[in-house]
Amino acid sequence: PNGPGSIQYSNGSQFSGSFKDGLKFNQGTYTFRDGTTARFQFLNDVPNGEGIINYKNGDVYQGSFKDGRRNGSGEIVFSDGFKFSGEFVDDVPNGNGVVVYLDQSKFSGFYKNGIREGKGSIISNEIKFDVNFKDDNFNGSGILIQGSNTFKNHYINGLRDGLSHHQYSDNSVFSGNYQKNEKHGEGVYIYP
């Protein structure tokens, strides 16, 4: 068939949209048995182009599809208000991405296979934190600015580990070592 039409599936889901040579083509909408709805652009029976999915739980994805999967730029707004926008490869965040949390703080950085990897920044009303990530944890150097205080730390698996340098708003300074987030070994405080 060619032109508009619909399909009722045995599992209770339904498709309505355009067909060309018997294949889904151009615009079409799925209504799934669980209440999830999806509107896609189709090419050769498969979602390719822009689309939007309204999940049963209230989450919404809007963005690009290729070969039936989220590929390219997209945004997910979760039912609790948490939001991710960025690049997807085969349904998984890969590339640059931005997360906006409920308190409106933001993470911006790079994702690899769905986890934070490489340079990233966390910004809120109170802090700015530039840090390296590995396997979704702080790893490597990081600089945290909180008001007039600056904290330069080295991290291993999310914990301060190694040389740290802290400069406080009263111009006092701490330099010393941390191990597993605890001060360890020698350190120096300098008071103004």
Give the residues covered by each predicted segment.
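Conserved anchor residues at repeat-unit boundaries in beta-strand-based tandem repeats, strongest
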Residues: P1-N2, I7, Q14-F25, T37-N48, ...
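Position-specific recognition of the canonical hydrophobic site in helix A of tetratricopeptide repeat
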Residues: Y9, Y30-F32, Y55, F78, ...
